[in-house]
Regions:
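ATP-binding N-terminal substructure of ATP-dependent carboxylate-amine bond-forming enzymes
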Residues: 1-124, 137-145
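ATP-dependent carboxylate activation and anion-phosphoryl transfer catalytic cores
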Residues: 6-22, 27, 47-49, 72, ...
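Short, solvent-exposed coil/turn elements at secondary-structure transition points
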Residues: 33, 53, 107, 135-138, ...
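A generic structural signal for short coil/turn motifs at secondary-structure boundaries
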Residues: 56-57, 109, 166, 297-299
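Positively charged, low-complexity/disordered segments
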Residues: 412-414, 419-427
């Protein structure tokens, strides 16, 4: 029996354990001090302590995770998302230790992790990129002139950033200079890389991403699109597929562009290519590529009847896959995912750690409702980690039915909860 160590926690760890069980593989959970009795630990076949509650001393400690994998004789490591999922040094260490890395090659993670490099590679693959300037351009004397040519407002972004961190909208050149310095400092602290770049801010925009799976050797397929336009603080909260009110011809072009890009990179495994769609101009632009499983992957799984995590594991272990040809991948119906955060919307979405005293689970016995959750009633939500605790995914024959199913199964117990905010967004 193969043993898979999951280098993560919470709902994504639980989700990966589900695929391990489906494959009849042995799952290993890792945990910090505060996560000793967490759901992912209870759910796994085996578990091992990796350090203190601070992420830097546990879930971000590559050496401790690899040491744990060796101790329990794990065959492979699945990183999930967040933490070390897109850390090329961790991926390389895993490979060098003789353990299988469930993810793309480290050099791919490097090139896609730096948005400046990724933009250059996108251009070489004939993908349109949003008008902007790279990090080197910021040192040139004609910077103000070039910014005016792009046109304000402009988005200042950290080259190594992600999750909405290190992004600021500026409306004039004076504001831009201050923002660049501020973003550089923030990026250095958050990502260890102070490089920033500029991008034209498209006011009437949609955030569309294409789920791909690469097999190396210039081959990849897509699993259609996800619309992730409903966000707060540049972070997604509701995702759906298919994307509404965009011409299918444009979406097909986007998907084919994503496949071409992934193929040109000899990409291996699950990945997501993100685009900005200009509603007024009806044009799309390459944003970035995420070299990991996405939080919102269940949306895609729901409409394509696939298991992307299972595919990741099988591909890494050299097991034959079924969905390797584009004509075998079909979509059916409409799916909506709502992320549930332990936050207080009335206090600018401040995290709300504490004990879960009451948890009412919707009827997930229904085939059109799915709940990916990392907690049970009585569990403690910690302030050490991201406050997202669950995702509820509804599938209907069409968008209206899918949204209505979401509204039915997401109750509104009080006026000040993340659930009430999700209801507001759905309406």
């Amino acid at each position: 029996m193969k043993k898979i160590l999951i280098a993560n926690r919470g709902e994504i760890a639980c989700r990966i354990i589900d695929s391990c069980k489906k494959l009849k593989f042995h799952s290993i959970a890792v945990y910090s001090d505060i996560d000793k009795n967490s759901k992912h630990v209870r759910k796994a076949d085996e578990s091992i302590h990796i350090g203190a509650s601070k992420a830097q001393e546990s879930y971000l400690n590559a050496d401790k995770i690899i040491e744990a994998a060796k101790k329990l004789k794990a065959d492979a490591i699945h990183p999930g998302y967040g933490f070390l999922a897109e850390n090329e040094k961790f991926a390389q260490k895993v490979i060098d230790s003789g353990i299988i890395w469930i993810g793309p090659k480290p050099n791919t993670i490097v090139s896609m992790g730096n948005k400046d490099i990724a933009r250059d590679l996108a251009l070489k693959s004939n993908l349109p990129i949003c008008p902007g300037l790279n990090n080197k351009d910021l040192e040139k004397e004609d910077l103000e002139k070039k910014c005016n040519e792009i046109g304000f407002p402009i988005l200042v972004k950290a080259s190594a950033g992600g999750g909405g961190i290190g992004m600021q909208i500026v409306n004039d050149y004076g504001e831009l200079i201050k923002s660049v310095e501020k973003t550089k400092n923030l990026a250095k602290k958050a990502f260890g890389n102070s490089d920033v770049f500029l991008e034209k801010f498209i006011k009437n925009a949609r955030h569309i991403e294409i789920q791909i799976f690469g097999f190396g050797k210039k081959k990849a397929v897509h699993f259609f699109e996800r619309d992730c336009s409903i966000q707060r603080r540049f972070q997604k909260i509701i995702e759906e597929s298919p994307a509404p009110k965009i011409d299918r011809k444009i979406l097909n072009e986007m998907a084919q562009s994503a496949v071409n890009f992934a193929s040109n990179q000899n990409y291996e495994g699950a990945g997501t290519i993100e685009f900005i769609y200009d509603v007024d101009e009806k044009k799309f632009y390459f944003l970035e590529m995420n070299t990991r499983i996405q939080v919102e992957h269940p949306v895609t799984e729901s409409i394509t009847n696939s298991d992307l995590v299972e595919m990741q594991i099988k591909f890494a272990l050299g097991i034959d896959l079924d969905l390797t040809e584009q004509n075998k991948i079909n979509k059916n119906g409409h799916a909506v995912e709502c992320r549930l955060y332990a936050e207080d919307p009335s206090k600018n979405f401040l995290p709300s750690p504490g004990k879960i005293t009451k948890l009412k689970i919707p009827n997930i016995g229904l085939t059109n409702i799915r709940l990916d959750i990392g907690v049970d009633e009585g569990d403690e939500i910690s302030f050490y980690y991201d406050p997202m605790i669950a995702k509820i995914i509804s599938k209907g024959a069409n968008r209206t039915e899918s949204i209505n199913l979401s509204l039915i199964h997401i109750s509104e117990p009080t006026r000040r909860t993340p659930i009430s905010y999700a209801v507001f967004c759905l309406k």
